[in-house]
Design a protein with these regions (language model features):
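Rossmann-like dinucleotide-binding cores of NAD(P)H-dependent redox enzymes
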Residues: 6, 12-17, 21, 92-93, ...
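FAD-binding core/adjacent interface of flavoenzyme oxidoreductases
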Residues: 14-104, 171-189
């Protein structure tokens, strides 16, 4: 079941995070989860201040994490609020498989999700602004990847963009004009 898949994923992630924390602690690394400011460099290394506490170290690793890009298109805010539009974080935690999934973006995340959700039964459409998938990937590799995903049932709208998100899908601007694509979920990737 999808619920078991999500539960297993969460357990694996927790175990990995715990392992990384233990390795960092064992190596004498101080981890600060807060906003910080690099003040200067001195004879001992880098001087950093966070929440009125100073740190001095020979090495500094800044791990900011990431957040999903939310495109500025009509209807996106309402779609996020209603749960129609989701980011990759929500997609990794869905316990119900959407019957139809529209994926905005044919990059790494979008293609991974297209592969997974098509293999568990979703009808998947990927909308990509470029004329090929997988961004800067070699064109031959991109074509082979697209063909493999199409064999799994994934549909592509290349050289296209989502113009508007509606209550039950999206209006997509393609080379042949506008097309309305119905979707249970829209992944912003």
């Amino acid at each position: 079941s999808q619920e078991a898949v999500v539960d297993r994923k969460n357990k694996v992630v927790k175990r990995l995070v715990t392992g990384v924390r233990a390795k960092l602690k064992g190596a004498g690394v101080t981890v600060v989860k807060a906003e910080a400011k690099i003040l200067c460099r001195d004879e001992n290394g880098v001087v950093v201040q966070s929440e009125n506490v100073g740190y001095n170290s020979k090495f500094l690793l800044i791990a900011t994490g990431s957040s999903a890009f939310i495109p500025k298109i009509p209807g996106v805010d309402k779609a996020i609020e209603s749960g129609l539009a989701i980011t990759n974080r929500e997609a990794l935690n869905l316990v119900e498989i959407p019957k139809t999934l529209l994926i905005m973006g044919g990059g790494v995340i979008g293609l991974e999700m297209a592969d997974y959700y098509s293999s568990v039964g979703s009808d998947v459409v990927v909308v990509e602004m470029l004329g090929k998938i997988a961004g800067a990937t070699d064109e031959k590799v991109s074509a082979v990847l697209q063909k493999a995903l199409e064999k799994k049932g994934v549909k592509f709208r290349l050289s296209s963009k989502v113009k508007e998100i509606t209550e039950n899908g999206a209006v997509v601007e393609t080379e042949n004009g506008e097309e309305e694509i119905l979707a249970d979920k829209i992944l912003l990737s």
